[in-house]
């Protein structure tokens, strides 16, 4: 998570039992100049010290385009004594018409000790009724998973790039989704990071004339930044899902073997270098190379299809940003059940 570059006020301190009354008073005082807007409930849970201020800054930026009721929680589960503080605030932005301020309210909690076990009750009692419930979980998942909490969540947001034990964490996500009867949409910001590069790869194979390459792909090479191996694994899973590769297995930490639809072997190799999360990808089919790489010092992708007997021709496509506000904003604009991601997760279980 990015560091706070300026101090953001948490707002007015309130007694937890008076939060709703104080919110009504806040809006009454601003009547005429402020318009309350909310399309979703967005709860943010973190166990990092100082995250309350950091996430308040993120909410200030996010609500420029995504009106919500934000419930921001910082929890210290290791504290010996109970501690609970609460604040209310509003993130206001001038409307495009320029005459009124459109405001999203935020309720903030700093919890410590045994009272952190009351997370579910605290969240539920401050949801804006009848609006979808998005939960952004910034901590590690841990057992036991609270079935009541997960049964209410409509969209679970997390970043698998931060997981120390991906297999164990994914198993707990499976438990949470089961508690929600499969209704909960999984929103992995690590998957969102791949949006632009997946689009760049997909356009190579849009023309029917390129489909004969599907069963001829022999090797894939992916370059990723330190700490982003899991992002590369998701990219492998996407290729496997779209191209119907099966029998995935890891040959060490950097080499993977899969089987294509024609029962031929496909070898995937990872390499690590400083730079973007996914710095480059090369797919080889016979004498043809399909390549995508980040342009140095810009937010563009260099996209190339090169045949051995032809001159190399480069194109450019947008690369997107590896910025938490941009990633979350992209995620909130999405709809649907993220069915492709669900298939990808099934493909990579043997690779992570």
Feature roles, as predicted:
Residues 1-8, 12, 18-34, 38-41, ...:
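C-terminal structured domains
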Residues 69-78, 135-139, 160-163, 185, ...:
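A generic structural motif
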Residues 84-97, 154-163, 176-182, 269-276:
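Acidic, Ser/Thr-rich peripheral helices and adjacent loops at domain boundaries
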Residues 1-136:
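An N-terminal, globular interaction/scaffold subdomain
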Residues 108-109, 113-211:
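Conserved, well-structured core segments that form the ligand-binding/active-site neighborhood
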Residues 53-56, 119-120, 144-147, 229-235:
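A short acidic (Asp/Glu
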Residues 190-252:
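ATP/pyrophosphate-binding catalytic subdomain of soluble kinases
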Residues 61-72, 127-133, 151-156, 177-182, ...:
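Structural alpha-beta junctions
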């Amino acid at each position: 998570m990015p560091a706070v570059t300026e101090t953001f006020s948490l707002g007015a301190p309130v007694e937890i039992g008076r939060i709703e009354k104080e919110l009504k008073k806040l809006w009454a005082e601003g009547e005429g100049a402020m318009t309350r807007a909310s399309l979703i409930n967005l709860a943010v849970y973190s166990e990092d010290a100082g995250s309350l201020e950091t996430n308040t800054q993120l909410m200030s930026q996010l609500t420029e385009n995504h009106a919500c009721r934000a419930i921001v929680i910082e929890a210290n589960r290791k504290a010996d004594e109970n501690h609970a503080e609460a604040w209310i605030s509003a993130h206001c932005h001038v409307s495009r018409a320029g005459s009124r301020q459109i405001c999203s309210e935020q309720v903030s909690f700093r919890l410590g000790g045994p009272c952190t076990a009351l997370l579910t009750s605290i969240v539920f009692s401050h949801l804006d009724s009848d609006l979808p419930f998005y939960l952004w979980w910034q901590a590690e998942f841990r057992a036991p998973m609270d079935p009541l909490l997960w049964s209410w969540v409509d969209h679970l947001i997390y970043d698998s790039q931060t997981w120390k034990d991906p297999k164990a964490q994914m198993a707990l996500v499976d438990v949470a989704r089961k508690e929600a009867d499969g209704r909960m949409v999984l929103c992995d910001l690590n998957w969102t990071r791949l949006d632009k590069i997946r689009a760049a790869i997909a356009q190579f194979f849009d023309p029917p004339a390129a489909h004969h390459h599907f069963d001829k792909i022999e090797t894939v090479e992916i370059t990723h930044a330190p700490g982003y191996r899991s992002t590369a694994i998701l990219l492998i899973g996407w290729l496997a899902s779209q191209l119907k590769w099966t029998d995935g297995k890891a040959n060490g930490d950097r080499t993977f073997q899969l089987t294509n639809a024609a029962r031929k072997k496909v070898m995937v190799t990872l390499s690590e270098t400083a730079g973007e999360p996914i710095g480059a990808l090369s797919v080889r089919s016979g004498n043809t190379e399909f390549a995508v790489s980040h342009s140095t010092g810009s937010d563009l992708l260099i996209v190339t299809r090169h045949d051995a007997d032809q001159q190399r021709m480069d194109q450019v496509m947008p690369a997107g940003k590896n910025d938490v506000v941009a990633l979350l904003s992209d995620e909130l604009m999405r709809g649907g059940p993220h069915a492709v991601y669900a298939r990808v997760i099934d493909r990579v279980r043997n690779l992570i």
